[in-house]
Regions:
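Non-catalytic substrate-recognition and accessory regions of acyl/acetyltransferase enzymes
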Residues: 1-102, 110-130, 134, 138-180
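Residues forming the Rossmann-fold NAD(P)(H) cofactor-binding site
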Residues: 106
Length: 180
């Protein structure tokens, strides 16, 4: 079984109809099903986020997706001055029920790290990879090296991420191939 990484677009939108997150894998599976079907392309067009998908080459099904967007971690400096550290946020990440426990989630994190590395090397500063995790996914992220935000940092909130647990990983200066 092989997978192709692709940017989600209108040509791939038809594949999203079959995408189905298992109710056992997260607290709100219908949200993730609906996001890839109805919101991902609009978010890309509005500049809100970019969605990457892994497509199973055999079945031509979307095995999983990750949506990335720019954000900042905010901390407080001397004299209560707000300091921001540029970050890349995993805004959405989901794996189809048929492809669970096959390394798809880790591969999607690898895509996010590769994008962060490309941005940092060639376009803009990125210090952290941030995710506001569904409560049922915290252990998954922690196994990959993500930690809870210390009291020094806060994630910018925009309403959608109020009921999640913010986690982050500081990216090393020289990222090599991510291997979970």
């Amino acid at each position: 079984m092989g997978f192709d990484e692709k940017l989600f677009n209108k040509e791939l939108a038809g594949l999203a109809r079959k995408f189905q997150v298992s109710p056992k894998s997260c607290n709100n599976p219908e949200y993730y099903n609906e996001y890839i079907r109805y919101s991902a392309i609009g978010d890309q067009q509005k500049g809100v986020g970019v969605t990457h998908v892994l497509v199973d080459t055999e079945s031509e099904r979307i095995a999983g997706y990750v949506t990335l967007r720019a954000t900042s971690l905010v901390s407080e400096g001397e004299n209560h001055v707000k300091l921001v550290e540029p970050s890349l946020e995993i805004a959405e990440l989901a794996v189809d029920a048929e492809f669970e426990r096959q390394g798809i989630g880790s591969a999607l994190i690898g895509i996010a790290i590769d994008v962060a590395d490309e941005l940092r090397k060639n376009y803009l500063g990125i210090r952290h990879l941030v995710v506001c995790a569904d409560g049922s996914a915290i252990d998954f992220y922690k196994k990959l090296g993500f930690g809870e935000l210390s009291t020094l940092y806060e994630v910018l909130h925009d309403g959608w991420n109020d009921h999640c647990d913010p986690l982050y990983i500081t990216l090393p200066e020289n990222i090599t191939n991510f291997d979970p």
